[in-house]
Amino acid sequence: MTLFPRFATRRSPLASLALAVTLAVSLTACSDDGGGSSSDGEAAENENSENENSENQNSAEGDFPVTISSDAGEFTLQEPPERIVSLSPSATEILFAIGAGEQVVAVDEQSTYPEEAPVTDLSGFEPNVEAVTGYEPDLVVISNDANDLVASLTELDIPVLVNPAPADIESGYAGMAELGIATGHVDETAEEISRIRSEVESALEEGPQEPVRVYHEIDDTFYSASSNGFIGSVYAELGATNIADEADTDGTGFPQLTEEAVIEADPELIVITDQVGYTPQDVAQRPGWDEVTAVQEDNVVTVDADLASRWGPRLPQFVSTAAEAMSQAAGVPAG
């Protein structure tokens, strides 16, 4: 399933940021629903619309206070946060890319990029409330609510922004816009989204002009990345035929296949990451896999796990890597 056709018309970067802001956040300008006569209602609607446009513009310029609505609920930031704790590697990369790095006081143990990120032993998978609050944060950014962290921090009046894994590239831009508003770096975020979008579009042109059957293996139990998730959406943008799509009946983006199903689907490209603990040679030596085209044509490749799984400033590198691998599998030069 192709989520975004390669040659679809795309919005300008600034227009996309505006759309992303609309999708990602609810600002204080949102008006309440109400009754009234037709004429009174129309007048009120016009007045509310004018107020909303004015306040949205102020928020887009980085003015505070702003009210953010995320998966953690709604909260208001009276001023730009100065002590951010990030428990999401993707959010960490984005925060530094949009100029909010100096506001970050601690990041989780998996946030290994960029080098200047203040890495700690904080866990994003099993967060400890006491450990997090020890950094006296005025904003905590997470990708999912592990250990009911949101409720625990909310009780302590610490705002939590849940910046979840996007379903595709476009919603990844929305997540970036959300962080830009929350930190007061809207202009920098617009510039970063523009850069990423431009480089992604250039990388997409490196891909083959014909479909390639792709299998992205998460681990040796045959979990894979379908087109319903962020990783798979990159292959979809490149026009791939993702062999995991049929198995993703619940739309999670990460279905589990059977070994027999993989062999029968005969992928032309198999992608594993450098964190799975085995090599392309190990994949090729699996019983029966010598029948798979990707194995026969030596198109089992390893990619950087961080690049493949993190949405943010390094997305163009993953798109370029995927495009090159797909072009090789298609037997045509990249680009």
PLM region spans:
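Alpha-helical, coiled-coil/dimerization segments enriched in small aliphatic residues
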Residues: 110-112, 228-254
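Short secondary-structure boundary segments
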Residues: 88-89, 144-145, 165, 218-220, ...
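Structured C-terminal subdomain patch of bacterial secreted/periplasmic proteins
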Residues: 148, 171, 175-177, 190, ...
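Extracytoplasmic ligand-binding site segments that recognize negatively charged/polar headgroups
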Residues: 148, 163-179, 211-234, 278-279
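Short helix-initiation/N-cap motifs at beta->coil->alpha
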Residues: 70-72, 120-130, 248-259
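A short, structured surface patch at a secondary-structure boundary
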Residues: 83-135, 139-145, 243
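Proline-aspartate-enriched helix->loop->beta-strand connector
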Residues: 128-142, 158, 258-272
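Bacterial Sec-exported substrate-binding components of ABC uptake systems
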Residues: 2-90, 186-215, 324-335
